[in-house]
Amino acid sequence: RQRQMCIRDRHAIGEAAYIIARGDADVMLAGGTESTVCKLGIGGFDAMHALSRRNDAPEAASRPFDKDRDGFVMGEGAGVLVLEDLDHAKARGVKIYAEIAGYGLSGDAHHITTPSTDGPVRCMRMALRHAGMNPDEIDYLNAHGTSTSVGDANEVKAIREVFGDHAARLAVNSTKSMTGHLLGGAGGIESVFSVMAIRDPVSYTHLRAHETSAHLV
């Protein structure tokens, strides 16, 4: 989908699943973490004009897909999954929360702040193909949704291209509205959220999208 910076933990989870599927391991730990809320990290993203300027209302600054979104809010944290061969997990008697049915990646390296639609389209189609699923079999999508003007619009365009008319029936949210953007830790924690959504099953509240951009509806 994009350069490794914000996707490497999802790559790690997908590759770990493939390692288990090949029979090279029974159990893998995979995920990511990031801690970049510092002068260098904030200064770099500020110079790129990627951060929200809503300093007067920081609690309302991270608002993916909202018409007044103006950039992301940096977050810190970690998310790690325990991946395990199904027979191995059953033999141990552990609770199984979800199955990784498919995985796609597309490091198109187009541009770090102005992504192309082609990358996420190929990524989602690859995941569907590996899972042996049709687009209309998907109910929920945890979007990348960083709260940037160009990035969110590009992602919605890609979702529409992959899912067609079914896109209007998808439950789509961005949990970055609650956590901010964890960069290299985003995929790990968002994978945990997605597993929890399957477990409960619920789609977690999408905060602060007061009015969705008209061209994104």
Which residues make up each language-model segment?
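A glycine- and small-aliphatic-rich helix-loop capping segment at beta-alpha/alpha-beta transitions
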Residues: 19-22, 42-55, 118-119, 154-166
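Short glycine/threonine-rich loop-to-helix capping motif typified by GTGT followed
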Residues: 109-120, 146-163, 182-189
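Conserved small-residue
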Residues: 9, 16, 45, 82, ...
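Condensing-enzyme catalytic core mediating Claisen C-C bond formation in acyl metabolism
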Residues: 56-131, 140
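Active-site nucleophile and cofactor-binding loops and adjacent substrate-binding regions
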Residues: 4, 8, 174-178, 183-184
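Stable alpha-helical structural segments in soluble proteins, enriched in small hydrophobic residues
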Residues: 12, 123-131, 158, 162, ...
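Conserved small/polar residues in nucleotide/adenosyl-binding loops
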Residues: 2-9, 205-212
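Phosphate/pyrophosphate-binding betaalpha-module
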Residues: 34-66
